[in-house]
Amino acid sequence: MRGRSMFKAAALLALLAQPVWAGAAEDQVLAAVNKARAGAGCAALTMNAKLAAAAHGHAKAMAEQNFFGHASKNGARFSSRIKAQGYRYSKVAENIAAGQSSAAGVMKDWLASAGHRKNILDCALSETGIAVVYQPDDKPLKGQKYAMKYYWVEVFAAP
């Protein structure tokens, strides 16, 4: 009986490893992205599970392996991560961010950056995957004073 209780406790901890707000934050980013796109005359993006898996995998890798960049530690670029999920695309783009504790914060920074804004407002892109991973025991990245703790990834694609 004790073994079963320990298993249940471990399963519960695994479920709680990601904050409850993570899904809500991703939904908030999607809503904000689509609001910005509507203002630019672009169609709304739709969520795609394969793109979301690619985004989550990279956000998780950055958080757990303590790095920040479009290329994974093994050198894989976002296009490779998207292909690995079985998604066939004609065009792709990626936005990453770290340190922002809210959807509003990450959107403010992305929209203030010319390259990130360009990806958000690219009317040729029609699908997206969004992920945020929270690493409570994160360590500061090399050259940084404070830990980022929040790692954001949004991938954009056109099939």
Which ranges hold each PLM region?
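N-terminal signal peptide c-region/cleavage motif recognized by signal peptidases
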Residues: 17-19
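Bacterial N-terminal signal peptides that target proteins for export
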Residues: 1-10
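Disulfide-stabilized extracellular recognition modules
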Residues: 98-159
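Short, surface-exposed glycine/acidic/tryptophan-bearing loops
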Residues: 50-101, 120-122
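A short alpha-helix/helix-coil micro-patch that ends at or immediately precedes a cysteine
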Residues: 23-65
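Conserved beta-strand positions that form and line the central face of beta-propeller blades
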Residues: 44, 95, 155
